[in-house]
Amino acid sequence: MTPQDFDFLRQLLRQRSGLVLSAEKQYLAESRLLPVARKHGLGSLGELVERLKAATFTAPIGVEVVEAMTTNESFFFRDKIPFEHFRDTIMPALMAARAREKRIRIWCTACATGQEPYSLAMGLKTIGPSLAGWKVEIVATDISHEVLAKAKAGIYNQFEVQRGLPIQSLVKFFAQVGEAWQIAPEIRGMVQFRQLNLLNDFASLGTFDLVFCRNVLIYFDQETKVDVLNRLARQMPADGFLVLGAAETVVGLTEAFKPMPERRGLYVPNTPAVKPTPASNVLKFALKA
């Protein structure tokens, strides 16, 4: 692939998905896009670039290129700490604040193959009677149609269920299907999957009490990070929560959120109305059901 072709691809990916591809990642583009070129009967990435130049913005080949370059790695209860925050801080605070309306909305902004929202759903299931009469909605979005199809099916191979999933949860919430495992219908039914590009307007999704936006911002340039964070803030109430990845922060990007003291990766809207839940009032529930 020529430097000019690679520059074109970098610009296309940035415009359509926000993904910033550094110059040293040409090898990654070649390995992921050659199968796309072959699928369309093209003999080289140069031919793929020419096809992209001639295609309309919404042409399927452009969508396939973006999906091929999007990082889709995910696993159950990834990094553990965010799910500890969910258990020990976020849910107790939201259940106290929403005791009257008994409704909580959660958004996983880049759900990939579904392990993150399903991990949250399994965590909610373990609360049991404490959530009786509550409506807890989990909306999970991703830019890729392909990974969303896998997420909706909820079928994972042996390697995938061994990455982070406690054996107790595997036994309780999964059924073996051949050599794979399918998550139980009751868990799948707790998650709504939708296709969404975070660069596009997402105001129509409504307000969310909790937003998981992990390992997404690291692929964006600073301008896009600021834009996404500020728009997320407009989708959240004053007492909402934002969870970012371990390598991500709002510091130096926006004043719409502030870090929650002693809660790594957890942020709250920048308003005096938000206070940490006292430890004595924390509701405990075990993620390892």
Cite the ranges covered by each PLM segment.
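A structural alpha-helix within SAM-dependent methyltransferase catalytic domains
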Residues: R87, A121-K125, A233
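Extended basic-aromatic, gly/pro-enriched interface segments that bind polyanionic ligands
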Residues: T109, P129-F212, V216-D227, T249-V251
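Conserved class I S-adenosyl-L-methionine
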Residues: K102-G114, S119, E137-V139
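A short glycine-rich, Lys/Arg-flanked "PGG" loop and its adjoining helix->strand segment in the class I
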Residues: V226-A238
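Conserved beta-strand signature within the Rossmann-like core of class I S-adenosyl-L-methionine
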Residues: A238-A246
